[in-house]
Amino acid sequence: MNKNELELYTFAVPKLELGDMQAGLESFDFIKKFLDKTLLAIDNIKNNLHIFNTLYRGEHINELKDLISIKNTIDKVIEKHEYLDVKNKEVNGVAGLISLTLAAEKLPILLDHVNENTLKVLESSVVLLDKFIADVDFRKSFMKSNDALGSKVWRKNINIETELTSFVDLNLVTDTVKIGQVIPNLYSLKIIHENLVTAGKKTQIFNLKKIEDTIESIVDRVKVIEGMMNNTEDSFTKQAISSVGDSLSDLGNMVRYHSLVYYVTAEVSKVAINIVKTLEKINK
């Protein structure tokens, strides 16, 4: 993993703050610039999903095959080596990996969350945006809803950023990692392997194209809303469009985290694979 590659997945989507929203009520140009910036960020994330989908063709991430292939090697590695003898051995690493054990434990949970919610919320957002465009009364009520595009549903019961940063520092990029820094002992490789295989099976690559297409649908709707913005003097419509912009920020970050969880799963799996393969080659 290199810094440029990681940055594709970690930049934040712009968010419309309350003060900006009030300014936006007074200036169509302000709202349009914000929407353009948000849509550009979302479009960049969509492109990253496409890149990921291209690199990891098939049903799951490519690393799943390698994980399954090393299963029988793990017991041999544990029997062959003492932890104290190999803990300072370096293997190809991941950006700021803090704990391989914790990563393997939490990634299946994070994957369940993004798989269950991302596409569902995006698809429901298309329906809501269609209604926003067609129904004046709905536009008036839209701005009163704190969860207009379903982002709170997606965040329910889990904070993805907190969970990710508990086992990986996304601001630190390294080429290698010491075995002793990421696992407490060699026996932990067995449960790590089991959890990462579970995570690998949860990486539903085939859904990424659906997510891309749904994002494109959202972009199309927002372009229509931009057109509405240029042809109205109605204050309710102005404020409602500001609310759309704010909700789009949440949707953009939702997709960013979805792709980031998939990406981290692949990179963390590589570390486990590299540890086992490296130790297999070392003579005791």
How would you label these PLM feature ranges?
Residues 1-102, 106-109, 114, 118:
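Leu/Val/Ala/Ile-rich N-terminal alpha-helices, chiefly Sec-type signal peptides and the beginnings
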Residues 65-284:
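Long, low-complexity or tandemly repetitive, helically biased scaffold regions used
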